[in-house]
Amino acid sequence: MTNKKRILSGVQPTGDLHIGNWLGAINNWVELQEKHETFLCVVDLHAITTEYDTKQLSKNTLSTAALYIACGINPKICSIFVQSQISAHSELCWILNCMTPINWMERMIQFKEKSIQQGNNVSIGLFDYPILMAADILLYDADYVPVGEDQKQHLELAKDIAQQRINAKFGKEENILKIPQPIIMKKGSKIMSLNDGSKKMSKSDINEGSRINLLDTPEIITKKIKRAKSDSYMGMEFNNPERPESRNLLMIYSLLSGKEVSELENDLSQTGWGTFKKIFTEQIIESLKPIQERYQVLINDPHELNKILIQGKEKAEVVANKTLSRVKSELGFFEIEK
């Protein structure tokens, strides 16, 4: 038995992971993994809530798991697994669906934003996305969930469902579901688009030039940075509200180089965009090189990668099935006598 607090998090395999996923999420997991019991999921069930390529889903799932490890996640101390491989996620999701008032769901900001993009193709799955996320979290009795500000509302929903709709209604002397607390990931959580410094970097952006993917070649990185939006000011600034692109690139540069933003701002106060972009490009290529090298070793050894995912699944399944069994028992489901 471990006395470590438990953490649960994950990323969708909807496309290549980018530097926003790395700096804003995975890097934080790397820092947390030594002191916490860590479960990291590739959330492929979430990936099908919008249109997707069936030929790419499996490939992207394996690639995402490989990138977790290439970025520093240690499979010897973390359980890395694929969401759809554990049926308890879908089963608990349905139970939570039946316990959650629909007006709670209608308040979800992200659905409103994403449904505008989807138009008439918006699915029930996208509407139900926060319930599946709640099931993901609650299945593992997570103490903490690392989230960005944009996911905080979804975590609050998970807490409300657990406390008000399950524990308060069906719990007797003890809670049925553990109430998780957020770890708000501030460092790197606001990596913005290369084309628009006011818009978050996203895998779903149709413009490939809006992001640097972790597997981009040096040639592609160079081209994307050259085309990245700039402004007419001289020198690089971080706190000027009229210069979101300058702020964004300085933030990324700071995280990659390990230098304080204030130091960079001082060093680059008289540096033009052309010169800065060359320096910035070199830093990105240098920072991504070891990740890309480790990734190639992993992806070219599918047997070892599958072994890691099987081990992760086995550990995760024990915890998930125990929680699901407890929920079903307390909610009155029939159980076959053994």
From Swiss-Prot:
Chain residues that bind L-tryptophan: D136
Classification via Gene3D superfamilies: HUPs, Tyrosyl-Transfer RNA Synthetase
Motif 'HIGH' region, residue numbers: 13-21
Residues the entry annotates as binding ATP: Q12, P13, T14, G20, N21, G148, E149, D150, I191, K200, M201, S202, K203, S204
Primary localization class, coarse: cytoplasm
Pfam families xref list: tRNA-synt_1b
Organism domain of life: Bacteria
EC class (word): ligase
UniProt motif 'KMSKS' region: location: 200-204
GO function terms (MF aspect): ATP binding; tryptophan-tRNA ligase activity
Record's subcellular location: Cytoplasm
InterPro entries in the cross-refs: aa-tRNA-synth_Ic, Rossmann-like_a/b/a_fold, Trp-tRNA-ligase, Trp-tRNA-ligase_bac-type, Trp-tRNA_synthetase
Record-level GO BP terms: tryptophanyl-tRNA aminoacylation
Function in brief: Catalyzes the attachment of tryptophan to tRNA(Trp).
Assembly with partners or alone: Homodimer.
Protein name: Tryptophan--tRNA ligase
Organism the protein comes from: Prochlorococcus marinus subsp. pastoris (strain CCMP1986 / NIES-2087 / MED4)
Lineage of the species this protein comes from: Bacteria, Bacillati, Cyanobacteriota, Cyanophyceae, Synechococcales
Gene from which this protein is expressed: trpS
